[in-house]
Amino acid sequence: MLHTEGHALLRAVGQGKLRLARLLLEGGAYVNEGDAQGETALMAACRARYDDPQNKARMVRYLLEQGADPNIADRLGRTALMHACAGGGGAAVASLLLAHGADPSVRDHAGASALVHALDRGDRETLATLLDACKAKGTEVIIITTDTSPSGTKKTRQYLNSPPSPGVEDPAPASPSPGFCTSPSEIQLQTAGGGGRGMLSPRAQEEEEKRDVFEFPLPKPPDDPSPSEPLPKPPRHPPKPLKRLNSEPWGLVAPPQPVPPTEGRPGIERLTAEFNGLTLTGRPRLSRRHSTEGPEDPPPWAEKVTSGGPLSRRNTAPEAQESGPPSGLRQKLSRMEPVELDTPGHLCPDSPESSRLSLERRRYSASPLTLPPAGSAPSPRQSQESLPGAVSPLSGRRRSPGLLERRGSGTLLLDHISQTRPGFLPPLNVSPHPPIPDIRPQPGGRAPSLPAPPYAGAPGSPRTKRKLVRRHSMQTEQIRLLGGFQSLGGPGEPGR
């Protein structure tokens, strides 16, 4: 009902029927109601074209008296004052709107104000009314300028970051356009009561009145039509190096020095990656070391392994001690030299049998478990079969890898009870003081011959020297001699 009455009010106002509009408003119609486009009855009255211009002013005055708001905008952002300036409402309608609180500085969505629409319309009286209203509010007009296109139509441009007026097309590019913003000092406002107009003839005054109210001098073209030369750019200096703080850990890194490129290098090694002042170069190639497959010469023991020859025993003492026993041991050996040698140790050192026996003696001396009984010389076959870890010269491999030699500086006991329990302490029944053998001469006048240690060589032979380099707290040779002295004394001799 109200919506229909609203449309009826707009139609009555648009047709200039004041009495019908009064009846609708008295009947309860809303004066500020708009249509689908947001247009109100006051906007319709400002845009309407009546036969009598006085009817428009009476309709606008009546609507304002009924409470119509002049600052309501439609969907395009235009107010009733803008519609009045664009539709040719005249200075009287603009004065009524300004008197009821219309704002002349409001802009629409296109950025144009009521002043711009008045300039587009070319209504000088309305424009003067708007300027007076702006001055009354303390607003200085500095953003309006006009120009005339070659075709004779007027166009308006608004500067200071404002888009051009709506509905105005730009002319051909041949016409000069005012590309500069006009200041208030360059605007010449001509009024009817100008002081300099009395000096002119009446015909000249009429011609000046036909001209626009505003005159904006165009910028003068430069005297020299040649394009100006570009100014030389100031030289750019390299930026100053920043000073690093002492707290920065990367500040202590020395700056990388540039490496001159080498023609002989390949492309990959020539590239370097720099990161935080560090230079990463290509890594050197890795070479295989201590390998029999590499280009290096194999060690001397590798030939013996491949040929199947016997390997020498590794002593715990350094090789420098093999040059000869100390002086104390030499005196002890001189006392322990046997009178008669019944063992095959007196063989020539250069003979093959002596070399084979010396090899067997080395193998026996490595472990006390494989020692032969005193005074007996095993055969080479028995000596090879009795060695559990011996190396066969034909096959070149060990027979029993489970039995290993014990290497150490501790005392090696020959007691069978202690040897059956390896890794434990010796039993308490072992006497630390063995009986002293009787070494007195026998009644036959023949001096007892001391049993020589098994496979003992000549006093000065290298085999004897090589045997004494074993580092034990108690020599196994002395234990064997003490056992031999006890067997020579017999069961009745110790009591003597």
Curated annotation (Swiss-Prot):
Keywords: ANK repeat, Methylation, Phosphoprotein, Repeat. Residues 234-243, 463-473 have a biased composition (Basic residues). Methylated at Gln-15 by N6AMT1. The keyword Phosphoprotein applies. The modification Phosphothreonine is found at residue 316. One of its GO terms (cellular component) is pi-body. ANK repeats lie at residues 4-33, 37-72, 76-106, 110-139. InterPro entries: AN34A/B/C, Ankyrin_rpt, Ankyrin_rpt-contain_sf. Transmembrane segments: none annotated. The keyword Repeat applies. Residues 147-473 are annotated as: Disordered. This is Ankyrin repeat domain-containing protein 34A. It comes from Homo sapiens (Human).
